C-alpha cells in the first residue's frame, strides 16, 4: 500500500538521522510541515529561552545563528552555537521538565522552525516508523555536548581553536572573539596570540 507523501518524509528523516549523518538531514523534519511545526523570523539579539523557563520545544535554524549560553557572575559563557540546519534546545529542561539553567539568543536575524514537545511525541505515536526519532534527536545533542567536553578538557589552546575552525567551518567569522574564547575555554588574550601565530604561519 502506498504511503502518504507526508509519512514518507518522516520515514526518510528517521532513517537519515543517525549518529553519522550530517545535521542537514534534520531539515527533513521541517519539510514535513505538520501541525506543531512553525517557522519564526526573529531579529538579532532576540531571547528565545530565558534562564528559569522550561524548554518544551526543539528549535532548528533555517537561516541565521543562535547562541546557547549560561551566566557565570556577569560573564556570558558560550555552551554551543546553532547555525543553519542545526537543532537547539535545553536538553535537561526538555527531557526532565526542569527550569533552564541556560539562555538561548539569536546573534543574527534568524529564521527557525519550532516544534512543541507534545506535538513531537504525538508524531512519534502517529507514525510508528518514528519510534526512535525522539532518541535520535537527543543523541545528536549528547554527541555535541560530548564533543564540547573533549574540546575543553583534552586539547590545548591552539588545538581547541583549530578544532573549532575545522569542525564548525565559518563559525568563527560569524561570532565575536569574546564568544569564541568563552566557547573553547581560553582568555581573549590567549585567543589573540593563537590567531596572530596562525596568521604568521599562513603568511
Per-range role (PLM):
Residues 43, 62-63, 83, 108:
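A cytosolic small-molecule/anion-sensing beta-strand core signal
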Residues 155-203:
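Phosphate-/nucleic-acid-contacting segments
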Residues 1-38:
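Cyclic nucleotide-binding regulatory module and flanking cytosolic helices
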